A protein has these predicted regions:
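Formylglycine-dependent sulfatase
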Residues: 1-192
Length: 192
């Protein structure tokens, strides 16, 4: 693995595809890591390579020889969500009939969460990151700060709420269901 976020090819048959074909309702709430989530490219220095001319050819830069990129692989790309926080993912998403995506970690989570946070707080950026952290002398670890984000607005609460709402909806009928709940934390940076 040369970088995080290699995408799963869109033509891959997933467990969710099989469950959906069998009559299941399927939902993804939160983090998934099924596609690229950053625009970062592999850096030669990461591997002790002094020059890009020593990198493998581009056709060997991914896990498959067929290129896996383009707009259809931008469902989890942070820059795409920053440009349009209300974009949503293309459904079905790897067999999930319903999906609300959370990208990254701590109080800096993006994806569908950013749109929700904007609808539920007048100035969401004032709650995010170490530059807006609360004073706390007990937090001294690198990549850690005491977040200003209230618990009810924190990504964990959002993902929990979505999952519980989905459970309530799905439980009201006789159709079987599968819900994947992917929390973004615990993960660095830590925001106790």
């Amino acid at each position: 693995v040369t970088t995080n976020g290699f995408p799963l090819p869109l033509d891959t048959v997933t467990l969710m595809d099989v469950l959906s074909a069998g009559g299941y309702q399927t939902a993804l709430m939160g983090k998934s890591h099924l596609q690229y989530f950053t625009d970062n490219k592999v850096r030669p220095e990461t591997f002790g390579i002094k020059s890009e001319k020593h990198l493998p050819p581009s056709e060997l830069s991914q896990a498959t020889r067929k290129r896996i990129d383009g707009p259809e692989y931008s469902n989890e790309l942070r820059s795409a969500w920053d440009a349009d926080p209300y974009r949503g993912v293309n459904l079905p998403y790897y067999g999930f009939q319903e999906a609300k995506i959370a990208l990254f970690h701590a109080d800096r989570v993006g994806g569908d969460y950013s749109a929700w946070l904007s609808e539920n707080h007048p100035d969401p950026m004032s709650l995010r990151g170490p530059e807006n952290a609360l004073e706390n002398s007990n937090v001294s670890a690198p990549q850690a700060w005491k977040t200003r984000m209230p618990e009810e607005l924190y990504p964990t609460s959002w993902i929990t709420g979505l999952t519980l709402d989905c459970l309530d909806r799905y439980a009201k009928n006789d159709q079987p269901f599968f819900i994947q709940c992917g929390f973004t934390d615990p993960h660095h940076p830590f925001t106790p």
